[in-house]
């Protein structure tokens, strides 16, 4: 009897701990946080109830430390949600629990005075280009995958989650995170890629310099000098000592990993959508060629 009572109490307190680990924000989303060894991972479910069992749709946001919500001084709070508001997300939540993970060391809700013109979180409003040091050190691809893995492991154990399907999608930098998640997590059933660069990140800067020279916006000599500087920066990103003195190099190294090598190894249905005037995703036009070479038919694309 004592063993039964003890088991009941443990389950009871565990349930209380989980139920008190979230709150509703702006009557739009439920905020959870997971305490890790050296990090606290905040994420939201874009809904106000969890009474319907649905699969997970994880949306991986783009670059920079954007908060999930902004609180203006004299107006109603509004949701950025990692850019999910650019999509018809209300349609998504009809069939899925839509999840967005906050950027590392970035508050979920930030007052308007602490966001710069690009809506990035800045702790000191007088220094609009200076981000939190911890964020800069945490801003690399493998860390985003690690954080997402922790969130997905937590969600798989929840009674309101249908584990028969797992959709992972990402925009811009988030497409790189989504790719790595799908590449390493066999439970992912569908992958969505929006405004993605199949060859990483740094190559788009080099291509942009060439285009600028072609349009005579800069000289070919200037383009060559700029390209050489990018080569040097990328070389520096592989130098551990230089990365320690300049943590920004970590992001350039990790996010410049060519994605196309991963995409053609991923077996699940993959949806690729991109704009026609986007330097980052210019080379998406040749992605179908790689799938054809491999005899793969799991790619759907939209330009």
Report the location of each language-model feature:
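Conserved alpha/beta-hydrolase "acid-adjacent" motif
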Residues: 279-286
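Alpha/beta-hydrolase active-site loop
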Residues: 112-158
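Catalytic histidine neighborhood in serine/cysteine hydrolases
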Residues: 293-303
């Amino acid at each position: 009897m004592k063993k039964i009572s003890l088991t009941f109490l443990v389950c009871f307190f565990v349930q209380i701990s989980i139920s008190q680990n979230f709150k509703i924000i702006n009557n739009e989303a439920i905020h959870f946080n997971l305490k890790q060894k050296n990090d606290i991972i905040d994420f939201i479910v874009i809904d106000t109830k969890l009474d319907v069992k649905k699969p997970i749709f994880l949306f991986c946001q783009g670059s920079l430390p954007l908060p999930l919500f902004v609180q203006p001084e004299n107006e109603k709070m509004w949701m950025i949600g990692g850019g999910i508001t650019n999509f018809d997300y209300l349609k998504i939540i009809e069939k899925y629990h839509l999840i967005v993970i906050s950027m590392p060391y970035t508050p979920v809700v930030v007052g308007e005075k602490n966001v710069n013109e690009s809506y990035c979180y800045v702790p000191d409003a007088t220094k609009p280009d200076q981000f939190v040091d911890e964020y800069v050190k945490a801003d690399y691809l493998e860390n985003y995958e690690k954080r997402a893995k922790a969130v997905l492991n937590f969600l798989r154990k929840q009674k309101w989650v249908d584990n028969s399907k797992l959709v992972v999608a990402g925009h811009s930098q988030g497409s790189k995170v989504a790719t790595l998640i799908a590449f390493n997590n066999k439970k992912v059933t569908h992958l969505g890629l929006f405004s993605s660069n199949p060859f990483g990140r740094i190559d788009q800067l080099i291509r942009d310099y060439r285009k600028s020279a072609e349009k005579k916006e800069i000289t070919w000599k200037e383009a060559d000098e700029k390209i050489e500087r990018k080569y040097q920066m990328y070389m520096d990103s592989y130098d551990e000592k230089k990365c320690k003195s300049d943590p920004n190099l970590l992001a350039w190294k990790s996010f410049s990993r060519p994605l196309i090598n991963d995409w053609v190894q991923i077996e699940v249905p993959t949806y690729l959508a991109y704009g026609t005037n986007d330097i980052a995703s210019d080379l998406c036009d040749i992605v179908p060629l790689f799938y054809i070479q491999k005899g793969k038919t799991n790619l759907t694309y939209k330009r």
